Amino acid sequence: MTEKEKMLAEKWYDANFDQYLINERARAKDICFELNHTRPSATNKRKELIDQLFQTTTDNVSISIPFDTDYGWNVKLGKNVYVNTNCYFMDGGQITIGDNVFIGPNCGFYTATHPLNFHHRNEGFEKAGPIHIGSNTWFGGHVAVLPGVTIGEGSVIGAGSVVTKDIPPHSLAVGNPCKVVRKIDNDLPSETLNDETIK
């Protein structure tokens, strides 16, 4: 198996010294650099760079700068996704994001893990676990999502949370480690919106 194949199969792989992966990360960093230095008003150019980075045709994806990712091609984005400023997608493992997702500033999606034994860690070994984000979710600022986590549709993750385990659909979850506080009633029709139902 190539190191990329090992990475995608969630096996230990050479993250630091494999030339193909080094080149792929350099490609992504160059595109991120260009995106981060493109005027916000240059919407067509920004769309072109975002599509180039993720190697797909995105549908109403908005990314505020600065933004960073390791590869880009291992992120699968739905439509109507908003990524606020200073977010990082560590996409050695696949990061899947559904439709209508709001991601607050300073959020990180971290798919990588390293050996606890420093001898192995110093040799560059790494393993990546996927992250799955359901549609209609919202992340407050400074949220960290760790490898192997699935966050269910319609959930809200409070600011500053560290998500180490799966979050069920339609849940309000906060804290470090992130825990479900209560269920969210997502069946309320929009015309019932007021100071009480918006909580």
UniProtKB/Swiss-Prot annotation:
The keyword Repeat is assigned to this record: yes
Keywords of this entry: Acyltransferase, Repeat, Transferase
Single GO MF annotation: galactoside O-acetyltransferase activity
EC assignment: 2.3.1.-
InterPro entries for the chain: Hexapep, LacA-like, Mac_dom, Trimer_LpxA-like_sf
Superkingdom of the organism of origin: Bacteria
SUPFAM superfamilies, per database record: Trimeric LpxA-like enzymes
SMART domains associated with the record: Mac (SM01266)
Sequence similarity: Belongs to the transferase hexapeptide repeat family.
Protein's name according to its UniProt entry: Putative acetyltransferase SACOL2570
Organism, as annotated: Staphylococcus aureus (strain COL)
